[in-house]
Amino acid sequence: MLHWGPKFWRTLHLYAIFFSDTPGWKEKYEAIQWILNFIESLPCTMCRHHAFSYLTKNPLTLNNSEDFQYWTFAFHNNVNKRLNKKIISWSEYKNIYEQSILNTIEYGKTDFIGAWSSL
């Protein structure tokens, strides 16, 4: 069985964290296109369907990085709820992704993915 989920989430959360705090229309458009292409590339047909359905019901919020991060956080929790996995709080998300990703960039560590890999 291919375990692509943790890598998908890591990439999605990274994109949101590094999204601009003052995006222009072009950056917002590119983010929307990136998300659509990313969802389309999911290896699981049912997952693609669920992701597009979630996006339709919960449009992207691209006012700034924090809004985009919150959207990815809510999306991840939505999937975890459907899969009967752990739901995390916003503060847990911030701790897992923001701080861990910054540490990864600074120190070249990659072990942070384990924090949510079993969720």
Curated annotation (Swiss-Prot):
Decide whether keyword Flavoprotein is in the record. yes
Entry keywords, A to Z: Disulfide bond, FAD, Flavoprotein, Host cytoplasm, Late protein, Oxidoreductase, Virion, Virulence
Can you say where in the cell this protein is located?
Host cytoplasm; Virion
Which SUPFAM superfamilies does this UniProt record tie to the protein?
A: FAD-dependent thiol oxidase (SSF69000)
Q: Which Pfam families match?
A: Evr1_Alr (PF04777)
Spell out the disulfide connections: C44-C47
Q: Which reaction does it catalyse?
A: 2 R'C(R)SH + O2 = R'C(R)S-S(R)CR' + H2O2
The protein's induction, as recorded, is: Expressed in the late phase of the viral replicative cycle.
Q: Give the superkingdom in one word.
A: Viruses
Q: Give the ERV/ALR sulfhydryl oxidase domain ranges.
A: 1-97
Subunit and partners: Interacts with A151R.
Name this polypeptide is given: FAD-linked sulfhydryl oxidase
Q: Which organism is it from?
A: African swine fever virus (isolate Tick/Malawi/Lil 20-1/1983) (ASFV)
